Amino acid sequence: MSRAAGVTLAASALVAAVLAVAAIPLDVLAHFAPVWLAAGLASVAAAAALRGAPLRRLSLACGALAIVAGGFLMAPELLRPPEPAAAPGAAGQIKLIQFNAYKRNGDVRRVADWLIAQDPDIVTLQEARHDLRDELLRRTGWSVAGAKEHVMIFSREPRLRMMRPPLRNSVLTYMNATYLGSAGPFEVVSTHFDWPTSRTFAQQHADLARVTAALPRERMIVTGDFNTTPWSDALRRTDLTLGLRRVDRALYSWPAQVGGRAWPLPVLPIDHVYVGKDWKVVSIERGPALGSDHYPVVVVLAPVWRR
Protein backbone atom coordinates (compact mmCIF):
# COMPACT_ATOMS: atom_id res chain seq x y z
CA MET A 1 0.00 0.00 0.00
CA SER A 2 1.36 3.46 -0.86
CA ARG A 3 2.33 5.87 1.87
CA ALA A 4 -0.20 8.40 0.55
CA ALA A 5 -3.03 5.90 0.94
CA GLY A 6 -1.90 5.01 4.45
CA VAL A 7 -1.75 8.65 5.46
CA THR A 8 -5.22 9.25 3.97
CA LEU A 9 -6.64 6.32 5.94
CA ALA A 10 -5.03 7.53 9.16
CA ALA A 11 -6.25 11.08 8.59
CA SER A 12 -9.79 9.85 7.93
CA ALA A 13 -9.73 7.75 11.09
CA LEU A 14 -8.40 10.70 13.08
CA VAL A 15 -11.16 13.00 11.81
CA ALA A 16 -13.81 10.40 12.68
CA ALA A 17 -12.35 10.01 16.18
CA VAL A 18 -12.18 13.75 16.81
CA LEU A 19 -15.76 14.32 15.65
CA ALA A 20 -17.08 11.33 17.59
CA VAL A 21 -15.44 12.46 20.83
CA ALA A 22 -16.49 16.08 20.25
CA ALA A 23 -20.08 14.89 19.77
CA ILE A 24 -20.30 13.89 23.43
CA PRO A 25 -20.32 17.52 24.66
CA LEU A 26 -21.45 19.14 21.38
CA ASP A 27 -25.06 18.14 20.78
CA VAL A 28 -25.15 19.34 17.18
CA LEU A 29 -22.55 16.66 16.35
CA ALA A 30 -24.24 13.99 18.48
CA HIS A 31 -27.09 13.68 15.96
CA PHE A 32 -24.60 12.08 13.57
CA ALA A 33 -23.37 9.40 15.99
CA PRO A 34 -24.17 6.57 13.50
CA VAL A 35 -21.92 8.26 10.94
CA TRP A 36 -19.00 8.48 13.38
CA LEU A 37 -19.57 4.87 14.43
CA ALA A 38 -19.68 3.66 10.82
CA ALA A 39 -16.56 5.66 9.94
CA GLY A 40 -14.74 4.11 12.88
CA LEU A 41 -15.77 0.60 11.85
CA ALA A 42 -14.65 1.25 8.27
CA SER A 43 -11.29 2.60 9.45
CA VAL A 44 -10.64 -0.38 11.70
CA ALA A 45 -11.68 -2.84 8.98
CA ALA A 46 -9.46 -1.16 6.37
CA ALA A 47 -6.46 -0.93 8.70
CA ALA A 48 -6.87 -4.56 9.80
CA ALA A 49 -7.00 -5.75 6.20
CA LEU A 50 -3.97 -3.71 5.09
CA ARG A 51 -1.23 -5.04 7.32
CA GLY A 52 1.54 -3.11 5.63
CA ALA A 53 -0.19 0.24 5.65
CA PRO A 54 1.78 3.22 6.97
CA LEU A 55 0.40 4.64 10.22
CA ARG A 56 -1.68 1.49 10.60
CA ARG A 57 -1.65 1.60 14.40
CA LEU A 58 -2.86 5.18 14.39
CA SER A 59 -5.70 4.20 12.06
CA LEU A 60 -6.69 1.30 14.32
CA ALA A 61 -6.55 3.42 17.47
CA CYS A 62 -8.52 6.32 16.01
CA GLY A 63 -11.08 3.99 14.46
CA ALA A 64 -11.56 2.21 17.78
CA LEU A 65 -11.98 5.54 19.56
CA ALA A 66 -14.67 6.61 17.06
CA ILE A 67 -16.47 3.29 17.62
CA VAL A 68 -16.41 3.71 21.40
CA ALA A 69 -17.57 7.33 21.31
CA GLY A 70 -20.32 6.66 18.76
CA GLY A 71 -21.45 3.60 20.66
CA PHE A 72 -21.48 5.54 23.92
CA LEU A 73 -23.89 8.07 22.42
CA MET A 74 -26.18 5.49 20.82
CA ALA A 75 -26.23 2.84 23.55
CA PRO A 76 -28.98 4.34 25.78
CA GLU A 77 -31.41 4.39 22.86
CA LEU A 78 -30.52 0.95 21.57
CA LEU A 79 -30.65 -0.64 25.03
CA ARG A 80 -33.76 0.99 26.45
CA PRO A 81 -36.62 -1.41 27.22
CA PRO A 82 -39.14 -2.06 24.44
CA GLU A 83 -42.61 -0.60 24.64
CA PRO A 84 -45.27 -2.73 26.38
CA ALA A 85 -47.07 -4.35 23.48
CA ALA A 86 -50.79 -4.78 23.00
CA ALA A 87 -52.13 -8.00 21.56
CA PRO A 88 -52.61 -7.98 17.77
CA GLY A 89 -56.35 -8.45 18.30
CA ALA A 90 -56.72 -5.76 20.97
CA ALA A 91 -59.97 -3.82 20.78
CA GLY A 92 -60.25 -0.21 19.66
CA GLN A 93 -57.09 -0.06 17.54
CA ILE A 94 -56.20 2.98 15.47
CA LYS A 95 -53.67 3.20 12.66
CA LEU A 96 -51.62 6.38 12.37
CA ILE A 97 -49.14 7.44 9.70
CA GLN A 98 -46.51 10.10 10.36
CA PHE A 99 -44.85 11.48 7.21
CA ASN A 100 -42.87 14.49 6.05
CA ALA A 101 -44.14 14.49 2.48
CA TYR A 102 -41.46 16.98 1.28
CA LYS A 103 -42.53 20.20 -0.39
CA ARG A 104 -40.55 19.45 -3.57
CA ASN A 105 -42.07 15.99 -4.00
CA GLY A 106 -44.17 16.31 -7.14
CA ASP A 107 -45.26 12.66 -7.15
CA VAL A 108 -48.51 13.55 -5.42
CA ARG A 109 -50.53 10.66 -6.84
CA ARG A 110 -48.00 8.07 -5.67
CA VAL A 111 -48.08 9.46 -2.14
CA ALA A 112 -51.88 9.63 -2.15
CA ASP A 113 -52.20 6.09 -3.54
CA TRP A 114 -50.07 4.67 -0.74
CA LEU A 115 -51.69 6.67 2.05
CA ILE A 116 -55.19 5.72 0.94
CA ALA A 117 -54.25 2.06 0.51
CA GLN A 118 -53.07 1.94 4.14
CA ASP A 119 -56.63 2.75 5.29
CA PRO A 120 -55.40 4.82 8.27
CA ASP A 121 -57.45 6.49 10.96
CA ILE A 122 -55.04 9.43 11.30
CA VAL A 123 -52.38 10.83 8.95
CA THR A 124 -50.04 13.57 10.16
CA LEU A 125 -48.14 15.35 7.39
CA GLN A 126 -45.40 17.95 7.38
CA GLU A 127 -44.39 19.91 4.29
CA ALA A 128 -47.81 18.98 2.96
CA ARG A 129 -48.37 20.44 -0.49
CA HIS A 130 -51.82 21.82 -1.17
CA ASP A 131 -52.15 19.69 -4.31
CA LEU A 132 -51.56 16.62 -2.13
CA ARG A 133 -54.23 17.90 0.26
CA ASP A 134 -56.65 18.37 -2.62
CA GLU A 135 -55.90 14.91 -4.02
CA LEU A 136 -56.55 13.23 -0.67
CA LEU A 137 -59.76 15.14 -0.03
CA ARG A 138 -61.02 14.50 -3.56
CA ARG A 139 -60.52 10.74 -3.30
CA THR A 140 -61.56 10.12 0.31
CA GLY A 141 -64.09 11.24 2.85
CA TRP A 142 -61.32 12.36 5.18
CA SER A 143 -61.35 15.53 7.23
CA VAL A 144 -58.33 17.80 7.57
CA ALA A 145 -57.10 20.07 10.34
CA GLY A 146 -54.74 22.81 9.22
CA ALA A 147 -55.84 22.78 5.59
CA LYS A 148 -54.07 26.07 4.84
CA GLU A 149 -50.85 25.16 6.67
CA HIS A 150 -47.93 22.91 5.79
CA VAL A 151 -48.52 20.77 8.90
CA MET A 152 -51.84 18.96 8.48
CA ILE A 153 -53.76 16.24 10.30
CA PHE A 154 -56.05 14.07 8.16
CA SER A 155 -58.62 11.86 9.86
CA ARG A 156 -61.18 9.31 8.81
CA GLU A 157 -63.73 10.86 11.18
CA PRO A 158 -64.29 14.59 11.73
CA ARG A 159 -62.52 16.14 14.69
CA LEU A 160 -64.46 16.93 17.84
CA ARG A 161 -62.73 20.27 18.37
CA MET A 162 -59.52 22.19 17.93
CA MET A 163 -58.38 23.89 21.14
CA ARG A 164 -55.14 25.76 20.45
CA PRO A 165 -53.15 26.40 23.65
CA PRO A 166 -52.12 30.07 23.83
CA LEU A 167 -48.34 30.39 23.45
CA ARG A 168 -46.72 33.79 23.81
CA ASN A 169 -43.69 34.50 21.62
CA SER A 170 -43.82 30.95 20.25
CA VAL A 171 -41.62 29.76 17.38
CA LEU A 172 -43.30 26.34 17.18
CA THR A 173 -44.94 25.11 13.98
CA TYR A 174 -47.66 22.66 14.98
CA MET A 175 -51.24 21.54 14.49
CA ASN A 176 -53.53 19.92 17.03
CA ALA A 177 -57.06 18.58 17.20
CA THR A 178 -59.23 16.30 19.33
CA TYR A 179 -60.83 13.12 17.97
CA LEU A 180 -63.26 10.56 19.31
CA GLY A 181 -61.89 7.06 19.81
CA SER A 182 -63.51 3.90 21.10
CA ALA A 183 -62.15 4.57 24.61
CA GLY A 184 -62.94 8.29 24.57
CA PRO A 185 -61.54 11.53 23.14
CA PHE A 186 -57.85 11.69 22.26
CA GLU A 187 -55.55 14.56 21.37
CA VAL A 188 -53.33 14.58 18.28
CA VAL A 189 -50.48 17.08 17.99
CA SER A 190 -48.16 17.20 14.99
CA THR A 191 -45.10 19.41 14.62
CA HIS A 192 -42.17 20.25 12.38
CA PHE A 193 -38.96 21.45 14.02
CA ASP A 194 -36.19 23.43 12.39
CA TRP A 195 -32.68 22.00 12.01
CA PRO A 196 -30.53 21.75 15.17
CA THR A 197 -28.35 24.58 13.86
CA SER A 198 -31.30 26.99 13.92
CA ARG A 199 -31.63 29.62 16.64
CA THR A 200 -35.26 28.56 17.13
CA PHE A 201 -34.50 24.87 17.67
CA ALA A 202 -34.22 24.80 21.48
CA GLN A 203 -37.23 27.07 21.89
CA GLN A 204 -39.34 24.77 19.70
CA HIS A 205 -38.64 21.85 22.03
CA ALA A 206 -39.66 23.99 25.01
CA ASP A 207 -42.79 25.27 23.26
CA LEU A 208 -43.93 21.73 22.45
CA ALA A 209 -43.69 20.83 26.14
CA ARG A 210 -45.93 23.84 26.88
CA VAL A 211 -48.48 22.57 24.34
CA THR A 212 -48.64 19.06 25.79
CA ALA A 213 -48.89 20.44 29.34
CA ALA A 214 -51.95 22.48 28.35
CA LEU A 215 -53.93 19.53 26.93
CA PRO A 216 -55.14 16.18 28.33
CA ARG A 217 -52.20 13.79 28.01
CA GLU A 218 -53.67 10.41 28.97
CA ARG A 219 -54.65 9.56 25.38
CA MET A 220 -52.48 12.12 23.61
CA ILE A 221 -50.48 11.32 20.46
CA VAL A 222 -47.65 13.62 19.37
CA THR A 223 -45.97 13.09 16.02
CA GLY A 224 -43.66 15.00 13.77
CA ASP A 225 -40.45 15.63 11.96
CA PHE A 226 -38.35 16.66 14.95
CA ASN A 227 -35.07 16.93 13.03
CA THR A 228 -33.66 15.47 16.24
CA THR A 229 -32.06 12.09 16.89
CA PRO A 230 -32.58 10.03 20.06
CA TRP A 231 -28.87 10.13 20.98
CA SER A 232 -28.94 13.89 21.35
CA ASP A 233 -29.45 15.68 24.65
CA ALA A 234 -32.18 17.71 22.93
CA LEU A 235 -34.45 14.71 22.39
CA ARG A 236 -33.56 13.12 25.72
CA ARG A 237 -34.74 16.29 27.44
CA THR A 238 -37.92 16.29 25.36
CA ASP A 239 -38.50 12.63 26.27
CA LEU A 240 -38.55 13.78 29.90
CA THR A 241 -40.50 17.04 29.57
CA LEU A 242 -43.43 16.05 27.33
CA GLY A 243 -45.01 13.77 29.91
CA LEU A 244 -45.43 11.10 27.20
CA ARG A 245 -43.66 7.96 25.97
CA ARG A 246 -41.72 7.92 22.73
CA VAL A 247 -42.68 4.63 21.09
CA ASP A 248 -40.18 4.60 18.22
CA ARG A 249 -36.76 3.18 19.02
CA ALA A 250 -33.90 3.94 16.60
CA LEU A 251 -36.37 3.88 13.71
CA TYR A 252 -34.29 5.37 10.90
CA SER A 253 -36.40 7.64 8.71
CA TRP A 254 -33.99 9.96 6.86
CA PRO A 255 -32.76 10.29 4.15
CA ALA A 256 -34.87 8.40 1.63
CA GLN A 257 -33.37 10.40 -1.23
CA VAL A 258 -30.50 12.83 -1.71
CA GLY A 259 -30.38 15.37 -4.50
CA GLY A 260 -33.43 13.88 -6.16
CA ARG A 261 -31.98 10.36 -6.26
CA ALA A 262 -32.99 7.43 -4.10
CA TRP A 263 -30.70 6.79 -1.14
CA PRO A 264 -30.35 3.12 -0.21
CA LEU A 265 -29.92 3.39 3.56
CA PRO A 266 -31.55 5.80 6.02
CA VAL A 267 -29.00 7.15 8.48
CA LEU A 268 -30.88 9.20 11.09
CA PRO A 269 -34.08 8.56 13.10
CA ILE A 270 -35.64 12.04 13.19
CA ASP A 271 -39.38 11.32 12.84
CA HIS A 272 -40.96 10.42 16.17
CA VAL A 273 -44.22 9.33 17.78
CA TYR A 274 -45.09 9.95 21.44
CA VAL A 275 -48.16 8.61 23.24
CA GLY A 276 -49.88 9.01 26.60
CA LYS A 277 -50.24 6.34 29.25
CA ASP A 278 -53.59 5.11 27.92
CA TRP A 279 -52.11 3.76 24.68
CA LYS A 280 -50.21 0.58 23.96
CA VAL A 281 -48.35 -0.19 20.76
CA VAL A 282 -49.56 -3.01 18.54
CA SER A 283 -46.91 -2.40 15.86
CA ILE A 284 -44.60 0.28 14.52
CA GLU A 285 -42.65 0.18 11.28
CA ARG A 286 -41.05 2.26 8.57
CA GLY A 287 -43.00 2.66 5.34
CA PRO A 288 -41.60 2.70 1.79
CA ALA A 289 -39.81 5.48 -0.06
CA LEU A 290 -42.40 7.76 -1.67
CA GLY A 291 -40.37 10.48 -3.34
CA SER A 292 -39.80 12.42 -0.12
CA ASP A 293 -36.48 12.73 1.68
CA HIS A 294 -38.21 11.07 4.65
CA TYR A 295 -39.72 7.62 5.06
CA PRO A 296 -43.20 7.40 6.60
CA VAL A 297 -43.67 5.87 10.04
CA VAL A 298 -46.69 3.61 10.50
CA VAL A 299 -47.90 2.88 14.02
CA VAL A 300 -50.90 0.90 15.24
CA LEU A 301 -52.08 1.72 18.76
CA ALA A 302 -54.64 0.13 21.07
CA PRO A 303 -56.28 1.97 23.97
CA VAL A 304 -55.85 0.91 27.57
CA TRP A 305 -59.38 0.46 28.84
CA ARG A 306 -60.07 2.11 32.21
CA ARG A 307 -63.04 1.23 34.38
Task: Write out the residue ranges for each language-model feature.
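N-terminal Sec-pathway targeting helices
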Residues: M1-V7, A47-C62, N227
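Membrane-embedded alpha-helical segments of integral membrane proteins
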Residues: A5-A49
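Structural signal for the C-terminal ends of transmembrane alpha-helices
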Residues: V21, A45-P54, R159, W305
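N-terminal signal-anchor transmembrane helix
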Residues: A49, L58-D113, A117, D134, ...
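Soluble catalytic domains of enzymes that build or remodel membrane lipids, polysaccharides, and related
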Residues: L96, Y102-I116, T124-R307
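Internal catalytic or translocation cores that form aromatic/hydrophobic pockets or channels
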Residues: P120
